[in-house]
């Protein structure tokens, strides 16, 4: 009787161990993707997709796209790319900003949209992990309803955990120079993530991540500084009159966002400002404000991506888990999220003290996060200038302006650029390649 009981217990334990093994296999799934629906032929680069579980029970499943450098992946830098939002899929970076593929701009006719190769991919000289985060973004999901609500500071910890596990399974990249990069809202999360990785390198984690620095494009950094820069930017771009600008300066005294209710004069002029600018395309003021469904609209490609990413053959090729979220959306803006970092400037200071390099770039026609606000917070850090304001060139033409500081921070504008690198892909790529290779812009 006792033997039967022991035998029964052992069988139960074996079943449980088998289930745990399958669960771990499921959590840590990764697939090499040789071809993608919509792209003709084999992919001309190495693509891996997969999930890494984070959290106490690995309940949060973070989906990633990993593309190896086309030059020398054994030695080239490894970049982690975080798209803004929060809640915007990493596909935005991969297909529209710095990846080796993009959508072909054809009128949608009910068939699967096509993909084409790009010329100015950052993966020419760097390997990039494009990460869907926070949970609920892109193809990332939770296996239970019991998980902590994502937050800026919490994401820094989750991303660090993701990296530790990812590098544990890709140890060939553990010694590569590592950088965290992103744009827009990631201006709050990336500096915090860099600090978290740096802290982990000293306190807990072996082997340490070979962290070298970070890259940020048009980064949200400080809510007040960023918002207050919109009015001087609008004046400089001839979107408002001299008279309105002078009235705003006089009555608001530089505070255009959190205006006191009793300051009725300021509120009146702010309303006039809004009337002058509310029909401007915020992300690139030179482009028309148009409907997504219009094929000649700049953002029509986003609609095509939605059709592509929701196709069953695409999901199968990417090896998307069936228990993942249902419909894929490029940006899930209603994602439950706690915006608990109001300013990332203290993180920039700490990262500078730790000696990390940084590249901060701004498209100079972005109205969402104007370059003036970015210049203002960088200036407030009060680091000495070692290479003063000068043009940087592409093909003997001015591509933007740059300045380098003693804390290893390089600031650059991209002339004619918008909120993301997709508006000026050649200039953005050349800027990145020069900086990542340690060359002056």
From Swiss-Prot:
Expressed in seedlings and roots. Gene3D superfamilies: alpha/beta hydrolase. Keywords: Carboxypeptidase, Disulfide bond, Glycoprotein, Hydrolase, Protease, Secreted, Signal. The active site is at 184, 366, 419. The keyword Signal applies. Disulfide bonds join 88-331, 252-266, 290-297. One of its GO terms (molecular function) is serine-type carboxypeptidase activity. GO terms for cellular component: extracellular region. It is found in: Secreted. Its EC number is 3.4.16.-. SUPFAM superfamilies: alpha/beta-Hydrolases. It holds the Pfam family Peptidase_S10. GO terms for biological process: proteolysis. Residues 1-29 form the signal peptide. Glycans are attached at residues 109, 350, 382. It comes from the Eukaryota. The keyword S-adenosyl-L-methionine does not apply. InterPro entries: AB_hydrolase_fold, Peptidase_S10. Its main location: secreted. It is an enzyme of class 3 (hydrolase). Probable carboxypeptidase. Belongs to the peptidase S10 family. This is Serine carboxypeptidase-like 1. It comes from Arabidopsis thaliana (Mouse-ear cress).
């Amino acid at each position: 009787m006792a033997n039967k009981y022991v035998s029964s217990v052992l069988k139960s334990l074996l079943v449980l161990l088998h289930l745990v093994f399958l669960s771990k296999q499921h959590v840590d799934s990764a697939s090499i993707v040789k071809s993608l629906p919509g792209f003709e032929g084999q992919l001309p680069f190495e693509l891996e997709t997969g999930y890494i579980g984070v959290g106490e029970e690995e309940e949060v499943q973070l989906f990633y796209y990993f593309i190896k450098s086309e030059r020398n992946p054994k030695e080239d830098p490894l970049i982690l790319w975080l798209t803004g939002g929060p809640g915007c899929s990493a596909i935005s970076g991969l297909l529209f900003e710095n990846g080796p593929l993009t959508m072909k701009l054809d009128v949608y006719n009910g068939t699967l949209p096509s993909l084409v190769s790009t010329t100015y991919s950052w993966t020419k000289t760097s390997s990039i992990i494009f990460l869907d985060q926070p949970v609920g973004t892109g193809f990332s999901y939770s296996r239970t309803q019991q998980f902590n609500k994502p937050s800026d500071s919490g994401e820094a910890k989750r991303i660090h955990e993701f990296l530790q596990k990812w590098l544990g399974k890709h140890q060939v990249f553990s010694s590569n120079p590592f950088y965290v990069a992103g744009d827009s809202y990631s201006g709050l999360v990336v500096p915090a993530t860099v600090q978290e990785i740096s802290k982990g390198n000293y306190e807990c984690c072996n082997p340490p991540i070979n962290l070298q620095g970070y890259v940020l494009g048009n980064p949200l950094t400080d809510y007040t500084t960023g918002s207050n820069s919109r009015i001087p930017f609008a004046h400089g771009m001839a979107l408002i009159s001299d008279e309105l600008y002078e009235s705003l300066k006089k009555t608001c005294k530089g505070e255009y966002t959190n205006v006191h209710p009793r300051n009725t004069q300021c509120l009146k002029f702010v309303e006039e400002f809004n009337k002058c600018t509310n029909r401007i395309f915020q992300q690139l003021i030179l482009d028309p404000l148009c409907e997504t469904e219009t094929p000649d609209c700049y953002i029509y490609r986003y609609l095509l991506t939605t059709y592509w990413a929701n196709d069953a053959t695409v999901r199968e090729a990417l090896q998307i888990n069936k228990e993942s979220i249902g419909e894929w959306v490029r940006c899930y803006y209603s994602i439950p999220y706690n915006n608990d970092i109001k300013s990332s400037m203290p993180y920039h200071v700490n990262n500078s003290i730790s000696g990390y390099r940084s590249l901060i770039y701004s498209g100079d026609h972005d109205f969402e996060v104007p370059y003036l606000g970015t210049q203002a917070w960088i200036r407030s850090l009060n680091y000495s200038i070692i290479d003063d304001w000068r043009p940087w060139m592409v093909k003997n033409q001015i591509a933007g302006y740059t300045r380098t500081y003693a804390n290893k921070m390089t600031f650059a504008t991209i002339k004619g650029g918008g909120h993301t690198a997709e508006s000026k892909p050649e200039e953005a790529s050349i800027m990145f390649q020069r900086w990542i290779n340690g060359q002056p812009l």
